[in-house]
């Protein structure tokens, strides 16, 4: 095994000796001093009596061969027989060696020493670490300047928010610090850590891990062939909202990582259907039994089609009905209706085949209507339909700004806290349009702590509530933290989650059309509301009989 020898007492050689011993090199430290206490006093005269005693005791406990009272002659150094040799400046001068290399600290014959002009405690420790790297290279028979990596001061990529940091005066170093001065200087350290994503993301806070660690564990989870997939809960409870990407100075995208993991595990049969089963069946219900696609009476093709979204029909069917009536009355060229789900549920679940089938169904229905301009009442639907390439899609808020508020709309709604939807993240046009519409309603808007592109997810996105209800509740609590009064949103999922969280919650269409939805409906009531909206539209507008077809079986009660 390679051995090391260190000659002469100075702070640099003391630290090098500890560094080499820490690397498991059998190390001898030759000094002229007679004891560990005397050695520490020579190397670190700035220490107090108690400090010197403590360091001497620590030195005695190290796996280090201390040779006291040594005659530090050139003959001793040259005859030590060690593979790695490091010397103090005094011994370096006695050996008559040239100035050590500025990078590797190597002199002739591979002897390590600190260069001239290198003063101070920090520099001694820095040079000792560099000497340790050179020692490793020499022990391995490599060039000491090979593969050293970054050394010394570098520009950090770490982002640190200094908005809450309290600046303080530095303590002059002089000949060293007293314990009180050292404590005062150390107290100025703000413990630099970039936690921008964790500050905003309830999911990361729930699991208490940084994105890099989560990514590694998710990767390992996906790669498991047999055994328990312990990270499935974390993968499925990410809201896929994209807030972390906006908050991260480097744009790290946990949503894409979790969605890719879901897709991969679905494709390889490793993801249980159970966690998303009800949500997927709910999508199928919306696109079968509760589905409706019709042109406006009197038209075969339409200029527009209203797409309220599956949650609007489930949570606020009256607002959806009145919105359609208003659009029909004020838009030329015919306004069709399309009741159904945009398919984002299957997209979030990683069921890409089902998502493509949903897009194909919607595309075929839109073609029957003449590929009209889609009016979406949900920002997530708007985003999903646009990205799926299903045609021109605009938000109902944009049209209402063009047309003006409907007759009878309120103009003094009072104070509200406006929450931005995850589906509008990065969509400044929609965010601005909703605010302008709210102002026309007489709303005095208060912004929550996280707003616009940095808004918190309500807990509905990504099917988090189906996978981990407790994590979804964390999302909701975080979004409502510090918010008072009416919580105004333009996403029905947000409206529902905030109401379930105990807040007074309203969707902007409820205000515009004076159609408050009341308490959040349960699962069965949501399905009933979708069917009722479909039947009401068929009955009132298309004059069709909406009686339920008789069942082919008889129910007997016992």
Question: Which ranges hold each PLM region?
Answer:
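Iron-sulfur (Fe-S) cluster-binding segments and ferredoxin-like electron-carrier domains
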Residues: 161-171, 199-218, 246-264, 351-352, ...
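Local cysteine-cluster metal-coordination motifs and their immediate loop/turn environment
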Residues: 187-206, 236-251, 309-312, 338-350, ...
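Immediate flanking context of iron-sulfur cluster ligation sites
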Residues: 177-195, 227-241, 331-338, 363, ...
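Iron-sulfur-cluster electron-transfer modules
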Residues: 1-74, 208-389, 523-558
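Short, flexible loop segments at boundaries between secondary-structure elements
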Residues: 392-412, 450-453, 502-538
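Conserved hydrophobic helix-helix packing surfaces used for dimerization/oligomerization
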Residues: 3-4, 111, 304, 413-416
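Long, compositionally biased charged/polar accessory segments in the mid-to-C-terminal portions
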Residues: 444-449, 464-479, 504, 509, ...
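Ferredoxin-type iron-sulfur electron-transfer modules and their immediate structural context
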Residues: 1-3, 46-58, 66, 82, ...
